[in-house]
Amino acid sequence: KPHFRNMIKQRGGMFAKGFLFGTQFTAYLQDELWLTMARHAVTQAQRIQTAAVQKGYRLFAVSPTNQVFPILTKTQIQSLQTDFTFELTAPVDESRDAVRFVTSWATPDEAVEALLQTL
């Protein structure tokens, strides 16, 4: 039908993207929910970053955010890939790569502990 999409919108069957995103942001900003969620993510990442340095790992970049960039050997990377999800960021040399771990509001302490025990 011609103008079918417009008819759906006019009758409330399809929300505008701006309305939906605005509703999400209203919820995030209420009672500083976004800050609480971000604080948890950054705290978890800092735990990983601090432990990695204490264990002797070099960092590709020091990050104050919810991302951690340790440099690992290719063997370590292969071993970690069986139990953890992360991104290969950049090759450092023939035997080592920088990887990126990202934490979120939903990253549990148990997941961080498991990673730290494996590193």
Q: Could you say what each language-model-derived stretch is?
A:
Residues Q46-R47, A51-L119:
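Conserved C-terminal alpha-helix-loop-beta "cap" of PLP-dependent enzymes
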Residues K1-Q67:
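Active-site C-terminal subdomain of aminotransferase-like
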